[in-house]
């Protein structure tokens, strides 16, 4: 079975059980902008596999001693780093380095 990592499949209770993070903390992560679960038409949160991975990242950073503001900065820097790597790869494909 091929699970699309962006497909919102999991309720908050399932996400909490799978990740070991209680539902209230998941709501706090959302309030702080660290997590953006999809919403059904009725407003129910639904989490994708990718979001479950992000919850794991957040939990690991918190366990390492960072506070939520520090976690936010690390996640922003990681996203920026990924974007820069993609841009570098694109430029390398566009014009190979002359040796």
Language model segments and positions:
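C-terminal regulatory/oligomerization modules of transcriptional regulators
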Residues: 2, 76-99
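A short, Lys/Arg-enriched interface patch at domain edges and termini
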Residues: 54-86
